[in-house]
Amino acid sequence: AEVAMSSALAQMDLQPLCIAGTNVLLLELPYYRRFRLKDVETIINRNDIQVVFAHIERFSRLWNKETFAAVMELPVYKQINCSSLCHARWRQRRQLLRWLSDGEVHLLGTDAHNLTSRPVNFQAAAQLLQRKQRTAELETCMELAEQLTEDGVQ
């Protein structure tokens, strides 16, 4: 599960919050518009963890363009949700596909919370990417996910 961003995280031992057996922290950025980017950078600059921003697509319309651009430029992996890809209107889907093709987004996540109202929907996103001739991007996402979860980050 993702960890909600808090300035207190910079002072904490983050290993217990990482994906089991790795040093990968799935970080959910704040939903409020005014947050301290410096707090996020402090966490990113730690040597003991690898940060992945969870469902980054949610913030493109929430924050102002400058804040979103600054976050997208940070040297971390970024993840989008399969449901966003599958259920987006054509303009947003085109943007998500562009981010994948340009290497700005690196991972797909399901954001599954249960088997009924928010089930795993990875297969639908994979099929969509194949239909849109984005098989290479799908494979890149899968390889990185495997690397991060099996090996952790060295």
What is each residue range found by the language model?
Residues 77-80, 85-87:
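Aromatic-anchored helix/helix-loop segment that forms the rim or "lid"
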Residues 104-120:
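Short acidic/histidine-rich active-site segments
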Residues 122-154:
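Mid-to-C-terminal alpha-helical segments outside catalytic/metal-binding sites
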